[in-house]
């Protein structure tokens, strides 16, 4: 179990906030839940990974400020005739991340003096950095497929391709963290 300190959030509010986000992200979420998710491209490749929550018709997405700025820009492209607002806020939130039975779990945590940042969490749990994502990773090439994708949720961007790679078999390559705190994609 590790504590992550997140300092920023993309706040999505308005009547269409939940349906807008739900139609784009790979994981389903219910009221008052906290989960991991991907935003996939139309080609099924991972564009972003993040933690998100849904409460009182408000969706909050947590990641680094750099990733949130890029994510907001991408969401703005899809926000046509959608009644919601997108704002990046300063938001100090602590999350407890744990690996339970090969499933990556997340929940809020009390304020902690010992915590890790997003980069350290990416290395520890072999989650893709933005540089690795730009190389074109498929969801099944990352260790935590079942924690980030709900294959029974229905439509989301990249869903058809993600389902194909999930049911097609073993990936050709996989993301690995290396002891010198870097990542690389290794052929299997």
Where are these regions (language model features)?
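Basic, glycine/lysine-rich polyanion-binding surfaces/domains
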Residues: 1-188
């Amino acid at each position: 179990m590790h504590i992550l300190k997140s300092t920023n959030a993309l706040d999505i509010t308005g009547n269409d906030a939940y349906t807008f986000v739900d139609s784009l992200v790979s994981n389903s979420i219910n009221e008052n839940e906290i989960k991991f998710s991907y935003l996939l491209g139309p080609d099924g490749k991972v564009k972003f990974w993040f933690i998100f929550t849904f409460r009182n018709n408000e969706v909050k997405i947590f990641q680094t400020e750099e990733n949130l700025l890029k994510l907001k820009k991408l969401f703005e492209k899809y926000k046509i005739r959608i009644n919601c607002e997108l704002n990046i806020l300063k938001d100090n939130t602590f999350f407890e991340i744990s690996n339970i039975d090969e499933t990556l779990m997340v929940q809020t945590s009390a304020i902690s003096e010992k915590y890790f940042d997003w980069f350290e969490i990416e290395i520890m749990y072999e989650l893709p950095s933005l540089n690795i994502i730009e190389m074109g990773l498929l969801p099944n090439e990352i260790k935590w497929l079942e924690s980030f994708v709900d294959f029974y949720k229905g439509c989301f961007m990249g869903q058809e391709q993600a389902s194909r790679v999930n049911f097609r078999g073993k990936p050709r390559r996989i993301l690995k963290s290396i002891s010198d705190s870097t990542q690389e994609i290794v052929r299997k």
